[in-house]
Amino acid sequence: LKLLKESLIQKLSKKIDYKNIEKIKYLKWCYDKLLLNDNNTKTSILKPGSICWVDFGQNVGSELRKLRPAILWRSSADKKMWTVIPLSSKCYNDKYYFHCDINGLPCSTAKLESMANFSYKRLREPFFHNKKIAHLSEDDYSNILVSLKKYYTFEN
């Protein structure tokens, strides 16, 4: 294990261009993933429809990245895996059928095309709105469900 560690450090020292910010961010994300494995978020308080801060990490190309709020859509039975729908303020009111505006939060859009499954360890803490844990309204839930059906059945 010690040799593996030394070899990895040596390779990184030679191969990384420390002037390339994207490569530095990626290395930081690798380190952050180690820390995430120690995260023991209390999953008992999490439920579908809640909005939570989720660490999407430093991904490749135009994949979604960084810490951002996301809707907890559904979980595995033991709540160790969650399907999440990230939220964005940049897509609000843009009329794409795979973006669903959330009426219960100011300038928030559910990015259905970036729906993903993650370990509960990526869930940081609840997202608050008006001093309360944010949760989808029944109308927002229904609107997302309709949009998801369109997105996954190619009915636009």
Model-derived regions: residue spans:
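C-terminal terminal-subdomain/extension
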Residues: 1-30, 96, 100-156
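Polybasic/polar functional segments that serve as interface/processing modules
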Residues: 34-37
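Short, surface-exposed secondary-structure edge patches
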Residues: 40-45
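Loop/turn positions that initiate beta-strands
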Residues: 48-51
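Short, charged beta-turn/beta-strand-edge "cap" motif at the junction between a beta-strand
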Residues: 57-61
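Compact nucleic-acid interaction/catalytic patches
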Residues: 62-104
